[in-house]
Amino acid sequence: MKPWILLLVMFISGVVMLLPVLGSFWNKDPFLDMIRETEQCWVQPPYKYCEKRCTKIMTCVRPNHTCCWTYCGNICLDNEEPLKSMLNP
């Protein structure tokens, strides 16, 4: 066997084995860019608000709601409702 063929085979096998280790062979997961970082809720909501959960990408389905974290996990909190319930005894 000619020496340049042996070198070519060794080079190709080395590149094929090295690509998955470097991590450049696969594309990045597109859902990681969509996930938002949640902030702590600005009020301590009552337990009834723990039923409204955020989606997996930390957004809310309902309009005028914000995803935030509290003692019961990530919840969708209405931007106006907790303040109304705090003002009305």
UniProtKB/Swiss-Prot annotation:
Localization per record: Secreted
Repeat in keyword set: no
Q: GO cellular component terms?
A: extracellular space
* Major localization listed first in the record, in broad terms: secreted
- Example of a GO MF term: serine-type endopeptidase inhibitor activity
Question: Which keywords, in A-to-Z order, does the entry hold?
Answer: Secreted, Signal
Additional notes on this entry: Although this protein was isolated in a region containing several WAP proteins and was defined as a WAP protein, it does not contain a classical WAP domain.
The name this protein carries in UniProt is Protein WFDC9
Upper classification of the source organism reads: Eukaryota, Metazoa, Chordata, Craniata, Vertebrata
